[in-house]
Amino acid sequence: MTHRLPDHITRRLRLPLIAAPMLNVSGVDLVVAACRNGVIGAFPTANARSTDELDQWLTDIQARLFAAPEEAAPCCPNLIMRSPRMADDLACLVRHKVELVITSVGSPAAAVPALHGIGCLVLADVATLAHARKAIAAGADGLVLLSAGAGGQTGWLNGMAFVRA
């Protein structure tokens, strides 16, 4: 597991922050605004209603970030592992050569080889220490700790429990 984000990502950040991938909220405009302001802009792939729409979103995001006056922070699709679209969405992310992906709702194992094959870092949502250990064993580069008080799919652990482990 990676111990820190690589320089080609951190040098583009103003804050070490991910704008959360919020279901039915995070879209192209929010992601672009976050990235242009130096934070990682994340969005659930499910917010695009089809893989074709996801392809359009990524094309639009990448074009708008490339046109930005300063080098923008990366976008970070949130790939839902138990989605019926997972394989098609994963192929779309690979075609677009995304730099970061958050996997959620299941093990990242099915996505890690393809994403690592394009040099993409894989962050895995985890709600328990057991999930964290499984994600690390599956090849995740980092963890997104779903702790008590987090929005959306929350865990029940205090965030410090992960730190102690």
What residue ranges belong to the model's regions?
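Active-site entrance/lid segments in N-terminal catalytic domains of soluble metabolic enzymes
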Residues: M1-A165
